[in-house]
Amino acid sequence: MIVTYEAFGAKMFGGSRQEIIFSKHQKEIGKPAKWLSVPLVLTSNTWENGKNELSHQDPSLAESMLSETSDISRVLFPADYNSAAETLTQLYQTQGQIWTLVIPKRKIPVLFSMDESKKLLTNGGIRIDWAGHEADTALISLIAIGAYQLLEVLKASSRMKECGIAHNVSYLVEPGRFRVPRNRGEAEYITSETVFNDICLPSCRHVLMVSHTRPELMLGTLQPLWTGRSVKALGFINKGGTLDVEGMNFVNGCSWAHILREVGKLLSINEEVVFSDLERQVLNGNLSPDGVITKINNKEI
C-alpha cells in the first residue's frame, strides 16, 4: 500500500504509468501480471488540505490515472468507512492493477451499509434509496463523485425535499466503469445497462453532477450518462486557500447552495422558492457565507 497526500501524488504519475502500460501489454498477450494489485491512497485531499494554500490542493493524479486504461488503472472515491473497507476487500482479490483511492482523512458519517457498499463496489455506482424525493417520477438526477461532494449533494437534496422537488440521488465510486470503452479490456469492466438505467431513470431529463475532480474531465468520461439529457457539472475549478472543507466547497461553487441554484436553473424554478433572502445575498456575493451557507451549526466538516 502506498499512501500520500493528494497534491504530492502528481509527482508519482510517471512511474505509475509505466507499470500500467507494462501490465496492459502482459494482459493483451495472454500473460497477465500476477502481482497483487496495489492501492495508491490519496488522502489529506484537495478539499480538506488548507494548510499550505492552493499548492496542496490538486486532484491531478486521480484525473491522470482515470485517463489511463480503466481495466488496469482503476480510480475510486470511497465515501465512508464501509465503502473504503469494501474497496480494499475487493482490491486484494485482483492482480496486476493499480487502484488510485481518493479517501478523506477526516471523520465522515457512515453513509452506506455493508450491503450497500458491496453493491456500490460491484457495480461502480448506486442510486441511494434513502435520499431523494419521489425518485421514480423525478426529472432530475443528482450524482456525486467524492465523499465531500456527496455530503453537499445530500444537504441540497434535503432542501429540495422540503420544497417538494422530485429528484433522485446517486453516488459513483468508480467513474471509469461508466465511460465509453476504448479497448477490449475496458469493455469487460463497464457496468451493466441496468445500473446505468437505475442511476439515471427513464423519467430523468436533467443531470447535476458534483465531482471531487475538475468537472470537465468527468463530463467527457461519463458521456453515456448524459445522452439525451441536459447536464451541469460542478467540481474543482482551481480555487483554494487556507480554507476548511465548507470554504473550499463554497469558493469552487460546490456547496449545497450552489448545487441548489443550478438545479433551479435546469428545472426553471424561481430562486425565491428554494432560498431565503439572506441565502440569495450570500450567493450573489453581498454577504459572508459563514452562518448562512457554511458553519450553520458552528461545525466544520
Q: Positions of the model-derived regions?
A:
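Thiamine diphosphate
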Residues: 33-38, 43-63, 91-301
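Loop/helix-junction capping segments adjacent to catalytic residues or to phosphate/diphosphate-binding pockets
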Residues: 9-13, 85, 150-151
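Alpha-helical scaffold elements adjacent to nucleotide-binding pockets in ATP/GTP-utilizing enzyme cores
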Residues: 15-22, 64, 90, 156
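Active-site nucleophile and cofactor-binding loops and adjacent substrate-binding regions
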Residues: 4-13, 42-44, 76-79
